[in-house]
Amino acid sequence: MQEARRIRELPPYLFARIEKKIAEARERGVDIISLGIGDPDMPTPSHVIDKLVAEAHNPENHRYPTSEGLLAFRQAVADWYQRLYGVDLDPRREVVTLIGSKEGIAHISLCYVDPGDINLVPDPGYPVYNIGTLLAGGESYFMPLTAANGFLPDLGAIPSDVARRAKLMFINYPNNPTGAVADLKFFQEVVEFARSYDLIVCHDAAYSEITYDGYRAPSFLQAPGAKEVGIEFNSVSKPYNMTGWRLGWACGRADVIEALARIKSNIDSGAFQAVQYAGIAALTGPQEGLAEVRRVYQERRDIIVEGFNSLGWHLEKPKATFYVWAPVPRGYTSASFAEMVLEKAGVIITPGNGYGNYGEGYFRIALTISKERMQEAIERLRRVLGKVEF
């Protein structure tokens, strides 16, 4: 039987392709160093694991959870926002628990997008913004993120007829894949734009806590009026090394949160309650581990930037995320450069065109392996590339 058109038209998921390349190379006996997928390699804090173990022994947690999540977890999220950002959230109406923020990002279009509707999607950007749009029958209008504009979308360049048809605008800062950051002035411009065109802003803040050199990323919800026009997604995945635990949230505008909770109640049965209790421990417990996470990633960032600059690049150190976004050398496309370094150096990088057309000419490096393996990757590239030109 033929698959549905929505499946046939989906692009292959970027990271599934990368994982396949890694597996194939390792089957050939190649010692692969992966700078590709951004999956934290440090352990989850021990007090979080201990909480999971304790709650897993409670039979009450073996039953169906509520789709909107434990009130205690949503309260912990609200307290976290008040402590970090001074943002007030009603945990009952303005927070919903997610099975990882990716799940909510994929589902939010089902709440508002009908066939023929438009979502505003960053390019380059996390592929799920576009995929969720397509699954809902919508169309993506891609907002170019260019180095000349600090990898921020130029809101004034979006045609008014497109903006009037748009239902959702996805933004993501600190940004994957570019590592760019946004300030409250930009967020305020987004709020005014959303008001002008009656659209909903969906801010993906997954990397909000992965920051360096004393920089602290603002929340979109800190911008005056932001809670009237949008929501913010976040999770415990990156700051607490819990990507495999699948626990996140959306928070902000109450009617949007209610709509997302309604979709979830008809699609999934919520996150395992023991994991939610562990999430509470992560958000409310000791935070010294987060300081160490930042220190380790900052050290790795410096190794990558300084190492690639010694090969001829001119990279600046990103203020946030655990990615470095770099141009490909002269004579290569994103894909051809990634293929070459895999074949000749046994190093995986992520081609920028996997994040959209405006990612062409770039590649992404993830800082989620040990510094020793990073240094080895740089030396392998030195042997293969020599000194590069742009």
Curated annotation (Swiss-Prot):
It is an enzyme of class 2 (transferase). GO terms for biological process: lysine biosynthetic process via diaminopimelate, diaminopimelate-aminotransferase pathway. The gene is dapL. This is LL-diaminopimelate aminotransferase. Its EC number is 2.6.1.83. Homodimer. Pyridoxal 5'-phosphate binds at residues 101-102, 126, 176, 207, 235-237, 246. Keywords: Aminotransferase, Pyridoxal phosphate, Transferase. It comes from Moorella thermoacetica (strain ATCC 39073 / JCM 9320). It catalyses: (2S,6S)-2,6-diaminopimelate + 2-oxoglutarate = (S)-2,3,4,5-tetrahydrodipicolinate + L-glutamate + H2O + H(+). NCBIfam families: DapC_direct, PRK09276.1. Pfam families: Aminotran_1_2 (PF00155).
